[in-house]
Design a protein with these regions (language model features):
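Bacterial N-terminal signal peptides
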Residues: 6-15
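The canonical Cys-X-X-Cys-His
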Residues: 123-135
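Generic detector of bulky aromatic hydrophobic side chains
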Residues: 19-20, 137
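Positively charged n-region of N-terminal signal peptides that target proteins for export
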Residues: 1-4
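Extracytoplasmic c-type cytochrome modules immediately beyond a signal peptide or single-pass transmembrane anchor
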Residues: 20-122
Length: 137
């Protein structure tokens, strides 16, 4: 009986500690992504593999933390939820950016900066796609 109560208390504490993903969290993650992109670009200009790798890893870490806007996740109306594909689109963009970040690391390390720069450009396109379609720029 004590074990059950202990597990319930711990489970409740863990649930409460994982607060909802807020707009402030998203802004912080977006700023970290911007810094990571700057770091990758600086690494390209100075032909510095360490900067490129660190920036790509930082970008990958930040993109994994981002989540869809809370108001879309908590949508109560089933029809609006069905018609709204922003959650699916943002998850798809996250996956693509993460893949391209890995490509940047691999290509630049292997001595193919042209392909690494192309992956960087594709990440920028995905960022703009998200900001135009989801964030309504």
């Amino acid at each position: 009986m004590r074990r059950i109560v202990t597990l319930l208390v711990l489970g409740g504490a863990l649930t409460l500690s994982q607060a909802a993903y807020t707009k402030a969290d998203r802004i912080k993650d977006m700023q970290q992504m911007a810094k990571a992109m700057e770091e990758i670009q600086t690494g390209f200009f100075y032909n510095n593999n360490d900067l490129v790798q660190e920036g790509a890893l930082r970008l990958s870490d930040a993109i994994r933390r981002t989540q869809p806007p809370l108001e879309e996740v908590e949508e109560k109306d089933p029809m609006a939820r069905y018609m709204n594909n922003k959650i699916k689109l943002s998850n798809k963009i996250k996956k693509k950016i993460d893949q391209k970040a890995r490509i940047i690391i691999e290509r630049f390390r292997d001595g193919d900066p042209t392909q690494a720069a192309q992956a960087y450009t594709n990440i920028l396109k995905k960022c703009m796609e998200c900001h135009v379609q989801i964030r309504q720029w």
